Amino acid sequence: MAGTSGLLNAVKPKIQTIDIQAAAGWGIAAAAGAIWVVQPFGWIKKTFIDPPPTEEK
């Protein structure tokens, strides 16, 4: 079974740097697309930027 070694290398190649870069790029694209679809800018502004309302008694 000398041919099985070559077959396994074709099925399970080593992970290359470009594969990691491509996965990161697709992740960024997916996150940007999700933010574009949801557009939570009002919630982000209300939650993180505007000061909390003060209670006056």
UniProtKB/Swiss-Prot annotation:
Residues 45-57 are mitochondrial intermembrane. It is a single-pass membrane protein. The chain crosses the membrane at residues 24-44. It comes from the Eukaryota. It is found in: Mitochondrion inner membrane. Component of the ubiquinol-cytochrome c oxidoreductase, a multisubunit transmembrane complex that is part of the mitochondrial electron transport chain which drives oxidative phosphorylation. Component of the ubiquinol-cytochrome c oxidoreductase (cytochrome b-c1 complex, complex III, CIII), a multisubunit enzyme composed of 10 subunits. The complex is composed of 3 respiratory subunits cytochrome b (MT-CYB), cytochrome c1 (CYC1-1 or CYC1-2) and Rieske protein (UCR1-1 or UCR1-2), 2 core protein subunits MPPalpha1 (or MPPalpha2) and MPPB, and 5 low-molecular weight protein subunits QCR7-1 (or QCR7-2), UCRQ-1 (or UCRQ-2), QCR9, UCRY and probably QCR6-1 (or QCR6-2). Belongs to the UQCR11/QCR10 family. This is Cytochrome b-c1 complex subunit 10, mitochondrial.
